[in-house]
Amino acid sequence: DTFLADTRKDELPAGIFGFLEQFTGRLLALRQDFTPQIARLVASRLKFVQLPMRLLYLGPTFGQDGDGSRIEEHQGGAELIGEAGIKADAEVLGTVCLALKAMGFERFKVYIGDAVFVKSLLALPFQDNATRHAFCSAWRQRNLEALDVIVEKLPIDQQTKGTLVNLPFLVGSRDALKGRVSSSSWRPLQKSLQGVEGLFEALEDVLPEAEKCIELDLGAAPKHAYYTGLFFEVYAEGFPQLIALGGRYDQLFSVFETNVPAVGAGFKLSAIMKVRREPVNF
């Protein structure tokens, strides 16, 4: 199961380490992410197990870093499969925070985003795909000047244009963000904020100090395309590398001809060990 083959494509997405199999000529890829394999396992070998189920995993992942170097990392994680809704999201997110505290991390930040909100951005009436790609690039790079030029040409009202141009600033505590966007009537944004409110309410019993360590980043792009709702990234104070991430992926199981809601999280153990060795106060 370490090797994943995809005969439908002749190239691999960026960041994945792959090679041609010597005897068959098939394109093979080393595992970059555990979640698709967990979904395949549940849909095949565990399909008769009663839901919801909670699974843990531990093992190596393979990929490429920013300069193209091949890297091997160790990852551990947890998946809550078969349960939809905010309470399940809160259980996983709260578990991540409590686990980091148990590892000795006192100061870290969880940045949460919304994949539904992201899809609303991609569904805007762009002139063509090239413009959509340019918007995505400017949005991911938080390039205000480029965003302004692209958004100004969209056939939408001025208030929504103002909201879109300010995407890079949609970061902060829920109260700060609510104050910043209270004048916007754009429904995708307001709906996303309502979901955040529900998440914090669900976290009250799991993680009473959620306000101290969780911030919103509605201008963030998800690391994985299969996220369908909440997604999050975790960073230790004073350390630039990602130490944990996760999110909801309700549609991933459809690849295996089944329909199961799920949410999960993974810990970047190699990065966590590096933080523990660094002389920084985390």
Segments (PLM) and residue ranges:
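TRNA-binding/sensing appendages of the translation machinery
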Residues: 1-36, 90, 111
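Hydrophobic mid-domain F-helix/FG-region of cytochrome P450s
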Residues: 95-102, 116-126
